[in-house]
A protein has these predicted regions:
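Structural signature of nuclease core domains in nucleic-acid processing machines
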Residues: 1-131
């Protein structure tokens, strides 16, 4: 009930009424290995100074399911539910910031529209966390 009364809950209800709400969106996203593991990639580059110029960087595929996204007039809103038992919102931000960044990147590539907002809703804290 707390979620439905939250700002995100109200916005989702409005988006659903406008036909602009999507749930459980699967995706696959190709990300350069150097983006995910920059320290390792830099170390490999340093060790192979004689590396072949034509060698291509590895791509890592990330797949997942976005809990909820909806469209408002000025962009997309990404919402991820979390049930983790944490003490405060900053713990969830630290744990899941990268995950939501990749989710946003996937949505932007898929829909060719900007993600204007990334939100975590913590059921344990009964709180919206804007990233």
């Amino acid at each position: 009930l707390a979620f439905l009364n939250s700002e995100s809950g109200r916005r989702m209800t409005q988006a659903a009424g406008n036909g602009k709400l999507r749930k459980e969106q699967p995706f696959v996203l190709g990300v350069a290995a150097s983006e995910i593991y920059p320290e390792i990639y830099q170390d490999i580059q340093k060790r192979s100074q004689e590396a072949d110029e034509n060698r291509k960087e590895e791509t890592i595929l990330i797949q997942g399911i976005i809990d909820v996204w909806f469209e408002e007039e000025d962009g997309l809103v990404l919402l991820d539910y979390k049930t983790d038992r944490v003490r405060n919102a900053s713990q969830l931000k630290e744990l899941y910031h990268a995950q939501l960044d990749y989710y946003a990147q996937a949505l932007e590539q898929l829909l060719e529209k900007p993600v204007k907002e990334k939100i975590i809703y913590s059921f344990a804290l009964k709180e919206e966390i804007i990233l």
